[in-house]
Amino acid sequence: MVLSPADKTNVKTAWGKVGGHAGDYGAEALERMFLSFPTTKTYFPHFDLSHGSAQVKGHGKKVADALSNAVAHVDDMPNALSALSDLHAHKLRVDPVNFKLLSHCLLVTLAAHHPADFTPAVHASLDKFLASVSTVLTSKYR
């Protein structure tokens, strides 16, 4: 999916407003995913999945850091996310549908924390961006 210049601006602006809360938002999105889509818990059998768990917070920070990297390299996401794509495809073997589920939960989390900034245009741009990230992460599954 091709991001327009306006999409890239919207994504960078929206992610910039996340600021120092990125790890918290990542953890919140994971918690939403685990509650809304319980089958996703199967990839984390060794985690304490309770609210506020240090393991969920730690993984939420990893998710947020990966997204920050994708935002910073929006014009070259395949190279920026190559190692992460390898990890998910070959070692973790995460079902690709889970990226869509997490993307949805991230959108809900961002909308809940930044309702005034979450315009239809920003929503569409973030959705396209997260779909692009998902495509890159699943590109090595073939």
UniProtKB/Swiss-Prot annotation:
Binding residues annotated for O2, in chain numbering: 59
GO cellular component, one term: hemoglobin complex
Pfam families: Globin
CDD domains, per database record: Hb-alpha-like (cd08927)
Superkingdom, natural source: Eukaryota
Residues annotated for heme b binding in this entry: 88
PTM annotation (N6-succinyllysine): residues: 8, 12, 17, 41
Residues in Globin domain copies: 2-142
Positions carrying Phosphothreonine: 9, 109, 135, 138
A GO biological-process term: hydrogen peroxide catabolic process
N6-acetyllysine sites (modified residues): 17
Keywords: Acetylation, Heme, Iron, Metal-binding, Oxygen transport, Phosphoprotein, Transport
Annotated positions of the Phosphoserine modification: 4, 36, 50, 103, 125, 132, 139
Signal peptide start-end: none
Similarity comment: family membership: Belongs to the globin family.
Quaternary data: Heterotetramer of two alpha chains and two beta chains.
Function: Involved in oxygen transport from the lung to the various peripheral tissues.
Name of the protein in question: Hemoglobin subunit alpha
Source species: Sapajus apella (Brown-capped capuchin)
Lineage: Eukaryota, Metazoa, Chordata, Craniata, Vertebrata
